[in-house]
Amino acid sequence: MIPFSNPSASYQSHKSEIDSAIVHVLDSGWYVLGKEVEAFEKEFADFHGKSLHSVGVANGTDAIALCLKSLGLGLGDEIVTTSHTAVATIAGIEQAGCSPVFADINP
């Protein structure tokens, strides 16, 4: 097998910082929201320059639903997506009140 990536190498170079952050969060008891999430959202927005805000969400389904809702999309709107996707994609579309429309990928 040809290796696709080596996340362990990246982890090893930042191991002490990552481990310390994980222990800090676990010790605080704040797994959702909390100071670390707030700091991450601010740093993420700053990193992207023109972004005024960023919002951390629990998963990709919530991210898709919030993006669609922020665009004013909802009931009666159709979202074209690939038929070769995870169920979470469809869940996000339907959570926003939209209807998925499947399209084949044709290279």
Where are each of the predicted segments found?
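PLP-dependent aminotransferase-like
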Residues: 69-107
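Conserved PLP-binding active-site segment in aminotransferase class I/II-type PLP enzymes
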Residues: 1-70, 74-75, 95
